[in-house]
Regions:
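Membrane-proximal basic amphipathic "stem/tether" segments
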Residues: 1-19, 311-373
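Short internal loop-to-helix segment that lines adenine-nucleotide cofactor pockets
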Residues: 3-21, 109-179, 192-199
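SAM cofactor-binding core of SAM-dependent methyltransferases
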Residues: 6-92, 96-102, 107-115, 120, ...
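Conserved acidic-Pro-Pro-aromatic motif
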Residues: 23-24, 38-39, 44-49, 147-288, ...
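Short Gly/charged-rich anion-binding patches and loops
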Residues: 55, 141, 203
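Short, solvent-exposed helix-helix connector turns and helix-capping sites enriched
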Residues: 66, 284-286, 334, 362
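Short hydrophobic/aromatic-enriched beta-strand-loop microsegments
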Residues: 68-74, 180-184, 302-305
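Short, charge-rich amphipathic alpha-helical segments embedded
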Residues: 287, 291-324
Length: 373
C-alpha cells in the first residue's frame, strides 16, 4: 500500500498511552506481511491478515511475534446471492485488459523459458499469485468471518488482491457502518470498461462516496508495453519508470472535519476518533489529523494530552516550529513564510531532509522488529 510514512510522532505517542488492541486493522491480500509502519502503534494494534497463498501464510505465521496479529489462509470474496454478484454474472473478469502486452508479464515469461522460477517477491510485485499454491477455493465473506471471530469494530481496511478488489469492497456495503470503519486502502485500476460492475477507479470512487468516504490519497504506477520495455522501478518485475498509468492505491477516510457526518461522529468513541487521526497521520496527512484532534478535543482528551499529539503533527509537518502553537502563530503572523520556492538549492535541501527522515524512520522500524519479544 503506497502512501504510508516511516516516521510518525503521533503514532509513537499513541503507542505509549494506549490500551491493548484499541486499533483494528484488517489486511485482505496480506502477502508480504502486515506493513511494519502500522506496528508503530505498539500494543494498540490488533491485526488480521487474509491471503490465499498457502506457503506465504505459513511463513508469516511462523515469523509473527505479536500475539495480536493473526493470519487466515483463504480466498476473500462475496456471497453468490449478493446483489452485486448477481449483477456481475456473465460479465468478463477483466475488460480491456492490457496486461498480456505489458513488459512485466513478458519478463516473467522469459524467465520461465530459462527454467528460472519466480521468487516470492517477484510474484508479489508482478501480480503472479496464481502461480503459488493456493488455499481451497471456497470463498470467505470477510464481514461474516469478522463477526464469527468476535470482531465488532474495524478501523482500517486494506484490500489488495489483484483482481476482485471491487467485489470484496461490495461485501462490506453494510459492514462499513456496522463496523464503524474509519479508513480504507484499496488497489484501483484506471483501465477497464464503462460497466458499473467493473473494478475501475471511477466505480470505486462512486461507491466510496455513496458510503460517506472521501478520497485523501491516490498513487499511480506506470507499466510499459513489451514493444519498448522501460526500466523497472524496483529490483523485481513490476512498475516501470515509463509507460501507461495502470494500477494505483487509493486511501479513503471519513471526512469528519467537514460537518457533513456529525450524526455519524456523535456515535463514535474517543478511541475511534483518535484512530481516525492516526490513519491520517500515517498516510502523511498531519493537517487532516490535526483537524480531527482540534474538532473533537473534548472527546479525545480523556485518552491523552491532545496538545502533545498536535505538537507531534507539527513535527511531522517539518516546518521547523517547536510546537503546534508556534506553527499556527507563524501562519497567522507571517503567512508568506509558507510560500514555496523554485530555488534548486532549497528544493535539493528539502529533498535531502525528506530522504533522511524516511531512511531514519525505516531504521527505527527495523530496530523495533529486531528487539520485539
Amino acid at each position: 500500500m503506497d502512501g504510508l510514512v516511516n516516521s510518525c510522532p503521533l503514532l509513537d505517542y499513541i503507542a505509549k498511552i494506549s490500551a491493548p488492541d484499541a486499533f483494528q486493522l484488517v489486511d485482505i491480500g496480506c502477502s508480504g506481511g502486515i506493513d511494519r509502519r502500522w506496528r508503530r502503534m505498539g500494543r494498540r494494534l490488533r491485526a488480521v491478515g487474509i491471503d490465499p497463498d498457502v506457503e506465504e501464510i505459513a511463513r508469516l505465521r511462523a515469523q509473527e511475534k505479536n500475539p495480536a496479529v493473526s493470519y487466515l489462509n483463504a480466498f476473500a470474496g462475496i456471497g453468490a446471492d449478493h446483489p452485486f454478484a448477481v449483477m456481475r454474472q456473465g460479465k468478463p473478469e477483466f475488460a480491456r485488459d492490457p496486461n498480456p502486452r505489458m513488459s512485466t508479464v513478458q519478463y516473467v515469461e522469459r524467465m520461465k523459458r530459462k527454467d528460472r522460477t519466480a521468487t516470492g517477491k517477484e510474484k508479489r510485485s508482478s501480480n503472479l499469485w496464481q502461480s503459488a499454491r493456493l488455499a481451497d477455493s471456497e470463498i470467505v465473506v470477510v464481514p461474516d468471518y469478522l463477526l464469527s471471530a468476535g470482531i465488532a469494530s474495524v478501523d482500517f481496511l486494506k484490500i489488495d488482491v489483484d483482481g476482485k478488489d471491487f467485489e470484496i469492497l461490495h461485501s462490506f456495503d453494510q459492514a462499513l457502518n456496522e463496523l464503524q470503519i474509519m479508513g480504507i486502502g484499496i488497489e484501483v485500476r484506471v483501465w477497464g470498461s464503462d460497466e458499473e460492475t467493473d473494478g475501475t477507479f471511477h466505480n470505486v470512487d462512486r461507491f466510496m462516496k455513496a458510503h460517506g468516504f472521501e478520497l485523501f490519497n491516490l498513487s499511480l504506477r506506470r507499466y510499459s508495453t513489451a514493444a519498448l520495455p522501460s526500466r523497472f522501478v524496483g529490483r523485481a518485475p513490476g512498475a516501470t519508470e515509463r509507460g501507461r498509468v495502470h494500477p494505483g492505491d487509493a486511501m479513503y477516510a471519513r471526512d469528519l472535519g467537514s460537518g457533513m457526518y456529525d450524526g455519524f461522529a456523535d456515535r463514535l468513541s474517543g478511541d475511534k476518533l483518535l484512530n481516525l487521526a492516526a490513519i491520517f497521520a500515517i498516510f502523511d496527512s498531519p493537517d487532516c489529523a490535526a483537524e480531527v484532534l482540534t474538532k473533537y478535543r473534548e472527546n479525545i482528551s480523556g485518552l491523552g494530552d491532545v496538545d502533545t499529539m498536535l505538537d507531534g503533527l507539527a513535527a511531522q509537518e517539518n516546518s521547523g516550529a517547536a510546537s503546534y502553537r508556534e506553527h499556527m502563530d507563524r501562519f497567522e503572523n507571517a503567512p508568506a513564510e509558507f510560500l514555496g520556492s523554485k530555488n534548486p538549492l532549497v528544493l535539493a535541501a528539502r529533498g535531502l531532509k525528506h530522504g533522511y527522515r524516511k531512511w531514519r524512520g525505516r531504521r527505527e522500524l527495523l530496530k523495533r522488529e529486531r528487539l520485539a519479544p
